[in-house]
Each structure stands twice: as C-alpha cells, then as structure tokens.
Amino acid sequence: MKNREYQQIDPQALATPTPTPPPRSLPEHKPRRARRKWEVFPGKNRFYCDGRIIVARQSGVLPLTLGLILLTSGLFFIFDCPFLVKHLTSCIPAIGGVLFVFVIISLLQTSFTDPGILPRATPEEAADIEKQIDNPTGSSSSYRPPPRTKEVVINQQVVKLKYCFTCKIFRPPRTSHCSLCDNCVERFDHHCPWVGNCVGKRNYRFFYTFIVSLSFLTAFIFGCVTTHLALRSQGGNGLVNALQSSPASALELVVCFFSVWSILGLSGFHTYLVAANLTTNEDIKGSWSGKSGNEDVGNPYSYNSMIKNCCSVLCGPMPPSLIDRRGFVPSDDSVQTSPVEIELPAAKNDINMVGRAVTSGRPPPPPPPPLVVTLQQPAISMQNHSTA
C-alpha cells in the first residue's frame, strides 16, 4: 500500500467563526414621476387637461360672460323662436344658431389659447445678459451702466427694446409684460377679464371674431325680440299685455339693450386697430399715433394698405406656442450607479478582533496562520515501479 503523509491541523489555529449578520436590504429607489413644464410654470396661470388649456389665474369673470350668453340665447330659442317661426320664417333659429356657435367657439378659443407667452431666460442666459449690461470691472466709481434698452431699426424706424426684470430678457418688438398674468406676451394687445386671458399674437384673431360675432348675435336677438313684442301687441293687446304673455322677452330686451352699444363700439374700435395694424397698448400709449409728442413718427408695422393689414393680423399663419407647456422637465438628479463593496467574513473577523484589542488596551493578536493542508505523496522510483 502506498504511503501518504498528512499534516495535522491545529484546531486552535482555526478562527472562531463569527455569525454573519443578514445583508441589509437597500432602500428601493423609486423613480420620480416625470413632470411636465406646465406644472412648474412660473407665470400666474392655471392649466387644465394636462396643460392643454391655459387661462389666467383671475378668470372669475369668464363664467359670468359665458353665463350671460347662454342665458340670453337660451331664452331666445325657447320663448321667441317658436312664435317667430310660426308668424314669420323658419330661418330665424337657423341664423341665430350659426351666430351662437360662432360666439361660443371663438370665446373658448380666446380663453383657452396661449396668447403668445415668451419663455423666461434660463439662469445661464440671464447671467450672460447681466454681464453684458453691468460694468464688467466695477473699478470706476464714475462709470454709469448703460440703460437697459436696445435699439433696432424696423422699416427705417428706430424701436427700443426694453429689458424685463422679471423674465430676464429683452422684450421683442410689440411685446409687453402683463402684470396680472406675470408673463411677457408677444404682440400684447390687452388683458381682457371678460375672456379670462391676455389677448396677444396667438389669440387676437379669435378675440376679434368673438366680439364681431357677439355684436351680430346681440343685435339679431334684440331685433327679433322687438319684433316678437310688436307682433304680440297688435290687435289692441298693447305692450303691457305682450310683456305679460312673454316675460322672458322683457329680460332679453333689457340685457341686449345695455350690452349691444358697448359691444358694437368695441367691435368698431378693434376694426380700426386691425385696419391700421395697431394694438390697444400702442394706441393708448400713442406710440405711433402722435399722442406721445412725436408727430413725425409713423407705424413701422403698417403695410400702408387696409387690406394687407387685415390679412396680416387676421389671416396669417398661426404661430406656434413657445412655452412648450406639455413638454417634460429635464431631470435634475444625475444618479450614477457605483460598484457595491462586499465585506468578506474573514476580513470582518479581523476588524472585530482588532477593535476588541484596542478597547482592552492590549496589542492586537497576530492574525491566525493560514490553513494549509499538505498532501504529500511518496516519490515512487522507477525501480519500484518497474518491479511492481
């Protein structure tokens, strides 16, 4: 039998096994929900339908406008149209229905459309603009920073671009900052509380369609109600009996009488602005009409033709929205995965032994000798192998 030598293992040389604690469960990293830009929009606006609808925060008058239109039109279709169809023609409710649809659609488009809000400057862009404006050295006490305006030439007319301290941008031509919505609006006309939104470059055509169609609808209802009461008062009945037989017509008559004049006047005023290619803001300030004292100043945006101005304001292509309110906000947390370090039990035992020695004041014991198992086989000579 072949001889084999074994080296005995000292049991004291073996380190006492230390129970390994169960691995800690790392907290699950829940990914954040991607937020859209309308959720962090800095302006004073309200968004609905996941950012598809935008209105001003102070839009409490809009339900009143919509309610008056629905109430007056509903009373007209219920109480006046049946009598007029019976005694005059069936075209009256058809004409009234077309005007009513135009009014409602144009009102909703004016109220729920982005008027032309300009996005605010990013911190990097704002810092770059501030460097261009302020004194780069600041050493000279007599140095005066340049005014926060820029001058551009449009059709041989100098136009000043003012710096907006809120949006941190130089406003483009015909742009103004609305204090109610807290936004810079391109081709700003005015803030209309009746529609609950600013009127600017992107929704002015809807606003003009709304006031013109509303003036036609109001005048149409006023004329039809007057005709209805006149027909009822014939035959010796009198106006009092006619009002008593149709009290809803009296309410319509009062509402239309007090509103038709203001609506017709507003439609005529904006027709003049469209023909001259002006805005309400420019007309009030007298920027190009000589009211500001500059009599020789002409409107650089006018095409010198009423037809061209009307086509430019009302029939041009619809500009896209610049705020991208349904886009996603870029994630700020750049989480990088790092390699996981795993402690081996042997290394942990060494650390525990050193820690116990330090606390007791004794030098740490030497590490245990490595566990060596030596398996020695006797060398078998060729002679033995051959004789075997």
From Swiss-Prot:
GO terms for cellular component: endoplasmic reticulum; Golgi apparatus; Golgi membrane. The active site is at C192. It is a multi-pass membrane protein. Residues 1-58, 109-205, 275-388 are cytoplasmic. It catalyses: L-cysteinyl-[protein] + hexadecanoyl-CoA = S-hexadecanoyl-L-cysteinyl-[protein] + CoA. One of its GO terms (molecular function) is protein-cysteine S-palmitoyltransferase activity. It comes from the Eukaryota. Residues 1-33 are annotated as: Disordered. GO terms for biological process: negative regulation of innate immune response; protein targeting to membrane. The chain crosses the membrane at residues 59-79, 88-108, 206-226, 254-274. Residues 162-212 form the DHHC domain. It is found in: Golgi apparatus membrane. Its EC number is 2.3.1.225. Residues 80-87, 227-253 are lumenal. Keywords: Acyltransferase, Golgi apparatus, Lipoprotein, Membrane, Palmitate, Phosphoprotein, Transferase, Transmembrane, Transmembrane helix. InterPro entries: Palmitoyltrfase_DHHC, PFA4/ZDH16/20/ERF2-like. It is an enzyme of class 2 (transferase). Palmitoyltransferase that catalyzes the addition of palmitate onto various protein substrates, such as CGAS, HRAS and LCK. The DHHC domain is required for palmitoyltransferase activity. Belongs to the DHHC palmitoyltransferase family. ERF2/ZDHHC9 subfamily. This is Palmitoyltransferase ZDHHC18-B. It comes from Danio rerio (Zebrafish). The gene is zdhhc18b.
